[in-house]
């Protein structure tokens, strides 16, 4: 499996058989830039905000996952779990869907724009997590300290932070916190990669926080 980060909450996850899952593609206004001719088999959108729902960037035919429930597409099991974009049950920013993907026997949890610490029902529904894709920048999502709480609630092998300030965001990025604050609060070891490539047999070799670089 390969995992590449395109900035914000957008990842391309490629299975060993070549199936591509794209999460939360954004519009160009962020300062990040997606490839012009993207191809994916599955595209998930956690909520309907423009920095997470630009499915038109994908030029191939694909299955769009944007609902709650259980799905099976291209040999990948997917589960959508109801959460919120804020701490007030969605009254400020609306709903958010966490998506679980089982790819190559590895459970990946993409938290979208999660705005709160999880409750016991949500933790149970999410279940076992091998790789957690977690917002850490605050402002529109959980901040670094609540992100650590969610990390401890789900106890993944690997945490990949997302939705935080980077140089590529320019002035827009100043509304978010830096990833360093989450790293410091977590107390975990950190590795950096341009792209993460792993499998079920060697996943523990990458345990802790993995920071993926934005090209």
Where are these regions (language model features)?
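Active-site-proximal loop/helix segments of hydrolase catalytic cores
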Residues: 88-154
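Pre-active-site segment of Zn-dependent metallo-hydrolases
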Residues: 10-62, 66, 82-96, 114-125
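Active-site-proximal beta-strand elements of phosphoester/diester hydrolases
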Residues: 2-5, 20-24, 77-84, 98-100, ...
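Metallo-beta-lactamase
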Residues: 53-97, 101-104, 187-204
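Binuclear metal-ion centers of metallo-dependent hydrolases, dominated by the metallo-beta-lactamase
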Residues: 4-6, 92-93, 158-215
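Zn-dependent metallo-beta-lactamase
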Residues: 1-16, 69-81, 200-215
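Short secondary-structure boundary segments
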Residues: 47, 136, 162-164
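Conserved acidic residues
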Residues: 40-41, 130, 157
């Amino acid at each position: 499996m390969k995992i590449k980060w395109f900035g914000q909450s957008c990842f391309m996850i490629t299975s060993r058989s070549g199936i591509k899952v794209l999460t939360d593609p954004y519009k160009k206004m962020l300062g990040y830039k997606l490839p012009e001719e993207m191809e994916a088999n599955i595209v998930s959108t956690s909520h309907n905000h423009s920095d997470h729902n630009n499915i038109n960037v994908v030029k191939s035919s694909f299955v769009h996952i944007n609902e709650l429930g259980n799905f099976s597409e291209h040999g990948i099991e997917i589960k959508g779990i109801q959460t919120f974009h804020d701490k007030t049950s969605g009254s400020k920013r609306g709903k958010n869907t966490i998506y679980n993907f089982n790819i190559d026997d590895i459970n990946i949890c993409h938290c979208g724009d999660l705005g709160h610490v999880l409750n016991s029902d949500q933790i149970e529904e999410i279940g076992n997590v091998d790789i957690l894709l977690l917002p850490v920048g605050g402002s529109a999502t959980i901040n670094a300290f609540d992100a650590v709480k969610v990390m401890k609630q789900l106890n993944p092998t690997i945490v990949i932070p997302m939705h935080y300030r980077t140089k590529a965001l320019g002035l827009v990025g100043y509304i978010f916190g830096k990833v360093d604050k989450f790293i410091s609060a977590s107390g975990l070891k950190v590795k950096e990669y341009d792209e993460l490539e792993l499998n079920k047999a060697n996943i523990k070799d990458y345990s802790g926080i993995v920071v993926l670089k934005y090209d």
